UniProtKB/Swiss-Prot annotation:
Protein's UniProt name: ABC transporter ATP-binding protein YxdL
Phylogenetic placement of the source organism: Bacteria, Bacillati, Bacillota, Bacilli, Bacillales
Protein family per UniProt: Belongs to the ABC transporter superfamily.
Organism of provenance: Bacillus subtilis (strain 168)
Biological role: Part of the ABC transporter complex YxdLM which could be involved in peptide resistance. Responsible for energy coupling to the transport system.
InterPro entries xref list: AAA+_ATPase, ABC_transporter-like_ATP-bd, ABC_transporter-like_CS, MacB-like_ATP-bd, P-loop_NTPase
GO molecular function, one term: transmembrane transporter activity
Subunit architecture: The complex is composed of two ATP-binding proteins (YxdL) and two transmembrane proteins (YxdM).
Induction line: Transcriptionally regulated by YxdJ. Induced by the antibacterial protein LL-37, probably via YxdJ.
Keyword annotations of the record: ATP-binding, Nucleotide-binding, Transport
């Protein structure tokens, strides 16, 4: 399977009165169709890593390749087009526009690409049916629950079939039931449609839906583990690594999935 994302020797230092090296020689790759989580303590560098992959920030050295192309070498106009075509984003706070309906929010990537209205409607109803939100398309964002808003945000992220989905704490504002619904949505898109996704999360339950978890500590790769057939076993393995990282995993060890 070809690599959809390659992270090669990424370094990032934030300069100030006291310089801080956020990332140190980070390297890993994600295959096409893989669902991977990144975990680590606060300040470990995981958000910096996601920002660099998404081109919000730039590395001091090293390379990012997405579908074989380094977006950091593109000029502004081509970079904007690359982001619209190749990347899909899912945020903790949904980032839906209150002035638009749920359906209009989902279609935004297609609107920016000036797709024909008939094509947009067809794609909208296809993804809405897949995610079980067809009955929400004419509602405003304040009329639906947090979990429904996040499923709409996921629909927006995948409607244009990007190469890579980047999710930043997608369940951070959700209760346990909505978290389960959202993670099952992402898992089914990965399994059925071979969507490639990288998710930053602090939540071991959410991470247990992934095929692989990469752990970062103090800006460096600390460990990585792969899921087998049993999600409960994988969840407990995640807790074990978090314990080594100094987290509060013991508080969650009795959770059964």
């Amino acid at each position: 399977m070809a690599n959809m994302l390659e992270v090669k020797h990424i370094n990032k230092t934030y300069k100030g009165q006291v310089s801080y090296q956020a990332l140190k020689q980070i390297s890993f790759s994600i295959e096409e169709g893989e669902f991977t989580a990144v975990m680590g303590p606060s300040g470990s560098g995981k958000t910096t890593l996601l920002n660099i992959i998404s081109t919000i920030d730039r590395p001091d050295s090293g390379d990012i390749l997405i579908n074989g192309e380094n977006p950091h070498r593109l000029k502004r106009t081509k970079l904007a087009h690359f982001r619209r075509k190749q990347l899909g984003f899912v945020f903790q706070d949904f980032n839906l526009l209150d002035t638009l309906t749920i359906g209009e929010n989902i279609m935004l990537p297609l609107t920016l690409e000036k797709e024909a209205p008939s094509v947009m409607e067809e794609k909208l109803h296809g993804i809405a049916a897949k995610l079980g939100i067809e009955n929400l398309l004419n509602k405003r964002t304040f009329e639906v629950s947090g979990g429904q808003r996040q499923r709409a945000a996921i629909a927006r992220a995948v409607i244009h079939k990007p190469s890579l989905i980047l999710a930043d704490e997608p369940t951070g504002n959700l209760d346990s039931k909505a978290t389960k619904d959202v993670m099952e949505t992402l898992q089914s898109l990965n399994r059925d449609d071979h969507v490639t996704a990288l998710m930053v999360t602090h939540d071991p339950v959410s991470a247990s839906y992934c095929r692989r978890v990469i752990f970062i500590k103090d800006g460096e790769l600390f460990n990585e583990i792969y899921r087998g057939e049993n999600r409960q076993v994988f969840y407990e393995q995640i807790l074990d690594v978090l314990s080594m990282l100094g987290g509060n995993a013991n508080d969650l060890s009795s959770v059964r999935l």
